[in-house]
């Protein structure tokens, strides 16, 4: 895996947030390590008066308590908004039966709307919490948790976020908990991705950053090539999530001057 100067990376993120978000930020806090890390860094950059944390549960579980631990340890303003009535109303009015993934996407997009409603009313920016591992594999909801004004962790792999979290004082129980998108009860990232973050990051770094051949990656890591192909398929299959909508080109149909 690549070697990162973590102390300088932390300073760079803090400077970035301070430069881009001087009016303040709104952060969705899930109780996971990514949102906790973003919130800690934003507070270091802007001061606690300019950071609003929104805790938006659909389920009442340990994640809510972990999210409260983050905001209370930092002393920032926060609000707990139960999205269940909103989501259930939307689903009811849609009038079709949704599977658990589709329902999870409705939850993520509901949270996005709430974040932006607060940010607009306060003239602030929404800070996203996606990391590079999620971004490259498409492990986020399009126009949901993937939507933000700035994403301080977007160029850091999940394993690097864990390291930064430890260095800036994110509570240990949050750093060590199993990552989950919180889209349904019992859901975990690694189960859904079909691979551990440690191995995923090793493959992604070689596949995307170093542009190594699949066979060489498998040989380097001592793993079946099918594992590498699985990650490659995740990256290729989610390309549409990483770009704005496109349409056909008409350049060749335009008459000359």
UniProtKB/Swiss-Prot annotation:
What Pfam families does the record point to?
NAD_synthase
Gene3D superfamilies named among the record's database cross-references:
HUPs
Task: Give the species this sequence originates from.
Answer: Pyrococcus abyssi (strain GE5 / Orsay)
Per the UniProt entry, what is one GO biological process?
NAD biosynthetic process
**Database matches in PANTHER family:** GLUTAMINE-DEPENDENT NAD(+) SYNTHETASE, NH 3 /GLUTAMINE-DEPENDENT NAD + SYNTHETASE
Q: What is this protein called?
A: NH(3)-dependent NAD(+) synthetase
Q: What is the lineage of its organism?
A: Archaea, Methanobacteriati, Methanobacteriota, Thermococci, Thermococcales
CDD domains registered for this protein in UniProt: NAD_synthase
So where does ATP get bound? 28-35, 129, 158, 180
Which InterPro entries does the UniProt record give? NAD/GMP_synthase, NAD_synthase, NH(3)-dep_NAD(+)_synth, Rossmann-like_a/b/a_fold
The EC number(s) attached to this protein equal 6.3.1.5
Q: Which residues bind Mg(2+)?
A: 34, 134
Biochemical pathway: Cofactor biosynthesis; NAD(+) biosynthesis; NAD(+) from deamido-NAD(+) (ammonia route): step 1/1
């Amino acid at each position: 895996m690549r070697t990162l100067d973590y102390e300088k990376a932390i300073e760079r993120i803090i400077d970035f947030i301070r430069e881009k978000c001087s009016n303040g930020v709104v952060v969705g806090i899930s109780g996971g390590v990514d949102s906790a890390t973003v919130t800690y860094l934003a507070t270091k950059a802007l001061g606690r008066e300019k950071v609003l944390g929104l805790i938006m549960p659909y389920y009442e579980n340990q994640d809510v308590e972990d999210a409260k631990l983050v905001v209370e340890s930092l002393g920032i303003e926060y609000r707990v908004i139960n999205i269940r009535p909103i989501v259930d109303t939307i689903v009811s009015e849609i009038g079709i039966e949704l599977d658990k993934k589709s329902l999870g996407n409705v939850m993520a997009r509901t949270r996005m709307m709430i974040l932006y409603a607060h940010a607009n009313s306060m003239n602030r920016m929404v800070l996203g919490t996606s990391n590079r591992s999620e971004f490259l594999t498409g492990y986020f909801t399009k126009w949901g948790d993937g939507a933000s004004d700035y994403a301080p962790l977007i160029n850091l792999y999940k394993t690097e976020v864990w390291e930064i979290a430890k260095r800036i004082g994110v509570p240990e129980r949050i750093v060590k908990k199993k990552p989950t998108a919180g889209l349904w009860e019992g859901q975990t990232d690694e189960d859904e991705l079909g691979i551990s973050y440690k191995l995923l990051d090793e493959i992604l770094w070689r596949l995307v950053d170093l542009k190594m051949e699949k066979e060489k990656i498998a040989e380097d890591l001592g793993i079946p090539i099918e594992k590498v192909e699985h990650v490659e398929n995740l990256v290729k299959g989610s390309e549409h999530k990483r770009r704005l909508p496109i349409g056909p080109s008409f350049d060749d149909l335009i008459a000359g001057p």
